[in-house]
Amino acid sequence: MTGVQTCALPILFAWTLKGMGDALQIGTFVESIVGTSASASLFLPAVLFVVAVFLAFSTGTSWGTFAILVPIAIAMFPGADHLEMMIIAVSAVLAGAVCGDHISPISDTTVMSSAGAQSNHINHVTTQMQYAAVVAVVCIIGYIIAGLVQIWWVALGISLMLLLAVLTFIKKKIGRAHV
């Protein structure tokens, strides 16, 4: 296969998967899954993040995931009384969709990045996944905290401190490995 064919094939598969998803009404299915978790609204931002990661990873598109999940997230927290939680829920969808798209082997950006760098596509995906997994775990913890305290800036501050702690731990571990 030539370089262009290597890039075009995963994109063709992603379009096919999207068409199948539309025909199977995946949006309605995802809404029913997420809707059943609404009783545990404290964990809903974390649930939305995880669902968005898996949906974007499976479809290879963050924009398609936005289109499916953002209206669901907004509908779960209607009115001015729930504005803070609606903002947190929408941010969970956006962050999860971008994370899932970033690590998806069928994402157009991932395919083009590996082709542009002339690297093995699976190796490229594997290296991205290692870094994204650390951040995704911190995000999940941050969205659990956001659901509990329902104040976005508190959750953001705690998440940043947690991420700095993880990076400091990794730096110390790597420093010891080279000594």
Label for each model-derived stretch:
Residues 35, 74-88, 147:
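Helix-coil boundary and interhelical linker segments in multi-pass alpha-helical membrane proteins
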Residues 2-3, 7-9, 178:
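Short, small-residue-biased leader/transition segments that mark boundaries at the very start
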Residues 95-104, 128-142:
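Membrane-embedded alpha-helical segments of transport systems
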Residues 154-166:
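Small-residue-rich transmembrane alpha-helices that serve as helix-helix interface/gating elements
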Residues 82-84, 117-133:
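Membrane-interface alpha-helices at helix entry/exit sites of multi-pass transporters
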